[in-house]
Amino acid sequence: FQHALGAMHLATKAVHALRHQQVRISDDEAEALYACMLLHDLGHGPFSHALEHVFFPKNSHEDMSIALMKKLNTAFDGKLTLAIEMFTNNYSRGFFHQLISSHIDLDRLDYLKRDSFFSGVTEGNINSERLISMMMVKDEHLVFNAKAVYSIEKFLLARRMMYWSVYLHKTSFVAEELLIRLFDRAS
């Protein structure tokens, strides 16, 4: 829940930064982006990726997120249609999908910093505000100012270090394996 709010907060920062650079973003587009960031991990089961294949053996969490968003869209009389188009990369302005899901997206900007803080590992402490301030749109695609090269390198290195230090750490693997065995035994 905190991650969804954090990712949405970064979306508000990105919209503000891009509008400041004269990128035309309507209020409907901004709201759709915010909805995407709030709902992007809706398809995750408990314990995130660790039990994804246990609960949804035939679908990824992204597939489940889309299915749940479509159900919500029906309940909300189509108010999430634009958000679903952005989420599934079916919207004409591709930079919105890039903000939601790409190599440097708002999701990653939030979870790297958040996971770094809560794990006590400093490698993931990135300057997301600076990266967002360096975002630009060219031909409806997300690009970065040339001055962002160092920040992008730091982000990519931080992501790799977080995988080595936290996500792929032996303790994480053991904890995931214990969870999987518990659920296998219970079923």
Q: Could you tell me what each predicted segment is?
A:
Residues 1-35, 43-187:
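Sequence-structural signature of the catalytic-core scaffold of metal-dependent phosphohydrolases
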